[in-house]
Amino acid sequence: MLERTLRVLEYNKVKEQLLEHTASSLGRDKVKNLVPSTDFEEIVEMQDTTDEAAKVIRLKGSAPLGGITDIRSNVKRAKIGSMLSPNELLDIANTMYGSRNMKRFIEDMVDNGVELPILETHVAQIVSLYDLEKKITNCIGDGGEVVDSASDKLRGIRTQIRTAESRIREKLENMTRSSNSQKMLSDSIVTIRNERYVIPVKQEYRGVYGGIVHDQSASGQTLFIEPQVIVELNNALQEARVKEKQEIERILLMLTEEVAVEADIVLSNVEVVANLDFIFAKAFYAKRIKATKPIVNNERYMDLRQARHPLIDPEVIVPNNIMLGKDFTTIVITGPNTGGKTVTLKTVGICVLMAQSGLHIPVMDESEICVFKNIFADIGDEQSIEQSLSTFSSHMVNIVDILEKADFESLVLFDELGAGTDPQEGAALAISILDEVCNRGARVVATTHYPELKAYGYNREQVINASVEFDVNTLSPTYKLLIGVPGRSNAFEISKRLGLSDRVIDQARNHISTDTNKIENMIAKLEESQKNAERDWNEAEALRKQSEKLHRELQRQIIEFNEERDERLLKAQKEGEEKVEAAKKEAEGIIQELRQLRKAQLANVKDHELIEAKSRLEGAAPELVKKQKVNVKNTAPKQQLRAGDEVKVLTFGQKGQLLEKVSDTEWSVQIGILKMKVKESNMEYINTPKQTEKKAVATVKGRDYHVSLELDLRGERFENAMARVEKYLDDAQLASYPRVSIIHGKGTGALRQGVQDYLKKHRGVKTFRYGDMGEGGLGVTVVELK
């Protein structure tokens, strides 16, 4: 990506915000080196990885990345034989613990059923070095000191040191407390100079204690003397301290060598936790800006739903739907300055850069974005003063560079294209520049305030006009993007609300051509139609969501009903079996008594009569089958099934009608208001509804056959619309019409594309085209019939 593009789209500001969510310098280095990728597979994997980290945050709130530091230089020094300090070794131990803890954290979530395949692969690379970690922490305390327990020898040496220090202090304190010494000492304290214990003696008594003078006060009146009686003890103390230092160095060298042996593993672990820190920083940032994972496609179109700029407060900014690349490859946003056009432009650019960097973007779920090899942006004139160039010249230098490099894999963003020069020439240049980049197949978003470009949006198939809505009542932009509606200046309305007289405004209107007035009125009507369509869509969307909610609730109730029914049936069966078993036992007892009576000759009963009696008892008991859930046949119904057949769905015990076969073993079935997939093994054939006999219909050719010259499909569902188009074209041919119009509206373009795809295949169609400005523009297709 060009450095200028990253700068004008404020990519580095996004990275600055991302830095705030890293846990270590390792993660910060990753963020600082972050640049957008152009590799499709890599971008998809990065998005999936960020999504997994976001799932962890949703479930756990955080990730255990504390205590991790950049130990790479220390490990490399250990590898070449340098001795590491206690704090450096402690950092290594803490980082090894942090990596081990992170590995355990992710693996525990996976063991509990959370699907994290990518993060699981990452932590699988972490090798536990628990033994080395414990060796270091057993030798070095939290404060970075080598502890007594590091070795038996060190413990013994430090015992000697403490004993020597105690004896020295005892002798010196006795001296300072002596009444004879009070007049000779400047102060009754024991202090240290040059790592040896001394007492402060007045200058005139320097010869009383003998020993060694180590220091004197600033005035020279006090000498810090090591008395002769403790010189040997101080010497012994110093020798012990030397031994302590040697033992500490031996321990540190031993630990350093242990680190050197595992250096490659330690460095590998560090790289993994650096990546994990970076990954979770992206996930935390996504949570901060309320971003979601986009669907990444490789088909050069984007569909950003409720897109917001990440650097603007989400509570303040107005989200917009932005589509580019399917029905049109270029959006020309027209309208007055300070209307929010540039924010929309930057939103598109920064969302693409973020997505290609593996960052989630501030849009609604199911938004799609594509991968661009190059992103070019001509926004602002921040360099014009430095380069002593005019606004127009600075823009043109950049545009020339863009035209040299832009191709079908490029996204091009123009802000106020053609500005800074004569309006007529600027508009002409803008049109030529747009034609050039459009012809190369690039995806383009351009802003302009030139009215000439409004007509440009109507005259090019792959270009669509757009504007940012302006509220005349509040005299301020709403920042809502209106796709398909060109912008207008609103100068007359604003002037009127600000108090300008109607007479002056009417005179001003007379200075504008009739065509211009017609265009402005047409734009105003388009704006109103757009608002109405959007309102209708919102109402339909609300009804759809309500319907889906009711559908889910009904399905839930059906499942609960079946579960409760099965549970009650199972309970009843169990109770019945218990009663039958009790009856059998009672019968066995009776038979046994009869046998005993016969043996005692108290009854004359034959064996076959006993067996027959028991058989009658068992036959009287109903055969019960334990049932935990509804059993269905494993074989398909014997009757060959066809669409339209009535069947019984065994799971629900309900009748339904077959709609279509969706696989070798499954059908789509309509059960009341529900439509669901059902396996053939779970249904029972009932009957095939009788077909009503189709009667021949006489047709009349000519003007007496009443067929409208227009077919209005607005508001129709796609399947119904296609069926109406087929019938309408047949009727129009029967009526011998040479030309008809199909009104499909602009909308998302799906219906328009479906109509035109059908027309291409229809044998009765000679040619077709979009409507002219007076015929409905892109919202109408005019069809010439053979």
Swiss-Prot record:
Binding sites annotated in the UniProt record for ATP: 335-342
Any one biological process term the GO annotation gives: rescue of stalled ribosome
The transmembrane residues are: none
Residues annotated as signal peptide: none
Listed A to Z, the keywords are: ATP-binding, DNA-binding, Endonuclease, Hydrolase, Nuclease, Nucleotide-binding, RNA-binding, rRNA-binding
Under NCBIfam families, the record lists: mutS2
Oligomeric state and partners?
Answer: Homodimer. Binds to stalled ribosomes, contacting rRNA.
Name it: Endonuclease MutS2
Q: Gene of origin?
A: mutS2
